[in-house]
């Protein structure tokens, strides 16, 4: 390709999908002419950059090491994360046109554009440190825009040494460190699914008023028994109290009244078995239907059974609740600038889909406020901000071991931060996930 033709093609004709394709052989040509651009956090921290030595050798560097491993990704042995999603922008150069011509004649590479992400370095670091050495994932979103503020998955890896450790990482099936658990992990939702069951109940009955259930600590139907946590007897409950108590018996009863077909319809309205507005993800799975038996319906209604969901999907459902029922399309690229700091393009928030009515979202929000004020997430009460949320304990083996879940949002009158957290093998939601949520909310409002 001639010089002028190359510059015209590179600056006007190329498309994101084409240049990001692994089958596009022109990527090597672009890399020959452009020093790969930086990836920055929204608060001005360098997340990825290319260092060029005196002899022209280039080395991709990740100053935060493991902290942004999955979401920023890597640029060798293939690409992942933002390195893949933003490949087009990072290999673009919007230096002054005549400078590009001069650089071409002098054999000097152009400087690639800078991708400014939506990620907040302080919030990401807080999430990373709070999860600690435990397996799991943390997602933080801005519900009114869809900005992804933090995304952590563990076990992780150091992208600075990805090439040296590649074979070990690929073959380590025990840790699966390359797997982004936030978007690709599949977990039983546990009691966080009671948000879905509650929505289906409201759509079927038209109101939570008039509901009453006498919890005796266990419920048996067709020789299948469901117990509340530790067999706790909650006594007489209305709907709000049953939700705040995370009463398995009440919600197992509700599930049998609703039936599999109704729960399937509402679940698919919330994007189970459906495409998600993400670049890389695994579909959440909901298998209940009209022919499902009572025991499976009971299990499914409380978030067990065969249902599997990713932390990001639960964050999206929570985001819709926090945003009057409207899900905004999640995104990671806030803007792209040239080497001189001039803005080339910005991402405007866009509606993705209305998952529920504004009234339904408000009612679910009230249920979730009760969990914090009077229920299983009371540790988040009285911390200088308001929170609505739902804990979950998702059993995953025959020994009754549980993953710890929390989904929720803060500043309930005008929500500005949504979180979804899972700690593998962490026990109850209040034990492991809620303290991480507290760290995130504290960092967001007070740091």
Question: Regions from the language model: what does each represent?
Answer:
Residues 1-166, 177, 186, 211, ...:
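Periplasmic/cell-envelope proteins involved in peptidoglycan metabolism and beta-lactam response
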Residues 42-43, 144-191, 196-425:
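Beta-lactam-recognizing serine transpeptidase/beta-lactamase-like catalytic domain environment
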């Amino acid at each position: 390709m001639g010089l002028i033709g190359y510059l015209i093609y590179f600056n006007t004709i190329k498309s994101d999908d084409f240049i990001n394709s692994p089958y596009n052989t022109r990527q090597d040509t672009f890399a020959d002419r452009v020093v790969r651009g930086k990836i920055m956090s929204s608060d001005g921290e360098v997340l990825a950059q290319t260092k060029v030595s005196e002899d022209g050798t280039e080395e991709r560097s990740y100053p935060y090491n493991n902290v942004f491993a999955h979401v920023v990704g890597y640029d060798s042995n293939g690409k992942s994360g933002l390195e893949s999603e933003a490949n087009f922008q990072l290999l673009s150069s919007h230096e002054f046109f005549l400078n590009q011509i001069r650089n071409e004649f002098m054999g000097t590479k152009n400087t690639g554009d800078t991708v400014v992400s939506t990620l907040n370095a302080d919030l990401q670091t807080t999430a990373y440190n709070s999860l600690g050495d435990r397996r799991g994932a943390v997602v933080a979103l801005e519900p009114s825009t869809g900005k992804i503020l933090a995304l952590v998955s563990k076990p992780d890896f150091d992208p600075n040494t990805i090439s040296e450790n590649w074979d070990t990482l690929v073959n380590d099936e025990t840790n699966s460190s390359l797997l982004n658990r936030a978007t690709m992990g599949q977990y039983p939702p546990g009691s966080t699914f009671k948000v879905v069951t509650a929505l289906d109940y409201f759509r079927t009955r038209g109101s939570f008023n008039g509901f009453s259930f006498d919890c005796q600590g266990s419920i048996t139907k067709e020789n299948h028994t469901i117990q509340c946590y530790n067999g706790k007897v909650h006594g007489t409950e209305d709907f709000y109290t049953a939700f705040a108590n995370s009463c398995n018996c009440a919600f197992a009863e509700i599930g049998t009244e609703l039936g599999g077909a109704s729960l399937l319809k509402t679940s698919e309205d919330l994007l189970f078995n459906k495409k998600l507005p993400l670049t890389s993800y695994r579909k959440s799975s909901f298998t209940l239907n009209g022919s499902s038996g009572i025991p499976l319906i009971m299990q499914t209604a409380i978030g067990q059974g065969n249902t599997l969901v990713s932390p990001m999907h639960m964050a999206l459902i929570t985001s819709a609740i926090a945003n009057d029922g409207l899900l905004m399309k999640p995104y990671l690229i806030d803007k792209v600038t040239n080497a001189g700091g001039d803005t080339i393009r910005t991402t405007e928030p866009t509606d993705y889909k209305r998952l529920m009515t504004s009234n339904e979202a408000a009612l679910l929000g009230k249920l979730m406020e009760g969990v914090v004020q009077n229920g299983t997430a009371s540790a988040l009460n009285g911390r200088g901000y308001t929170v609505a949320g739902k804990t979950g304990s998702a059993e995953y083996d025959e020994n009754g071991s549980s993953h710890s879940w929390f989904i929720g949002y803060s500043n309930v009158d005008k929500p500005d931060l949504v979180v979804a957290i899972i700690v593998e093998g962490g026990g109850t939601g209040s034990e492991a996930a809620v303290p991480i949520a507290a760290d995130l909310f504290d960092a967001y409002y007070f740091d």
